[in-house]
């Protein structure tokens, strides 16, 4: 009797491709007097969750520039390129005006971003954010151009439920509160 075993080589892996999402946003930010209808194509990295992707979309909506004469805010390739943020606003001479991170980057990454951009924003959303922040807060005292926002876990998870391959999202901001609606 002959036994045949098929063994897969654990070192051979296939590169997974990004999943493409389309989003059409309607922005009404009454606090900043910004009204826009940007459309975007989102290349979602295979390891990126719905929650993280939608926090990137939220960050884009909350930071859309009122004046696009100095360029626009764009989704960057932070999951593929270690030297890029989640989003950035670059002017036409390639200067980084606004560097936006999502999640829980380390203090070195944030300090490097503060040195490269005029303004840096971080949108943290995981339930472990308070513990993470207590570990790096004192290391960021020199980062005067850094603003950190914490999105409550329940809200970021609710935002993730709006994920669809093709999305139509309305963002309304008034008195410091953001409402997000998918029309359903």
Name these PLM-found stretches.
Residues 2, 7-49:
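Extreme N-terminal leader/targeting regions
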Residues 87-89, 96-113:
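Conserved catalytic cores of phosphodiester-cleaving nucleases, focusing on short active-site segments
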């Amino acid at each position: 009797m002959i036994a045949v075993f098929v063994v897969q080589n654990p070192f051979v892996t296939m590169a997974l491709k990004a999943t493409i999402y389309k989003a059409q946003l309607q922005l009404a930010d009454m606090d900043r007097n910004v009204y826009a209808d940007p459309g975007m194509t989102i290349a979602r990295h295979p390891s990126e969750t719905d929650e993280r992707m939608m926090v990137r979309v939220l960050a884009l909506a909350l930071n859309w520039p009122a004046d696009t004469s100095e360029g626009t805010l764009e989704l960057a390739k932070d999951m593929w390129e270690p030297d890029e943020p989640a989003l950035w606003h670059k002017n036409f001479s390639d200067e980084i005006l606004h560097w936006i991170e999502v999640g829980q980057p380390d203090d070195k990454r944030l300090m490097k971003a503060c040195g490269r951009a005029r303004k840096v924003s971080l949108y943290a959303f995981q339930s472990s954010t308070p513990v993470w922040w207590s570990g790096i807060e004192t290391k960021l005292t020199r980062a005067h151009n850094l603003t950190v926002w914490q999105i409550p876990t329940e809200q970021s998870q609710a935002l993730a439920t709006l994920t669809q391959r093709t999305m139509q999202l309305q963002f309304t901001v008034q008195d410091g509160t953001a409402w997000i609606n998918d029309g359903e």
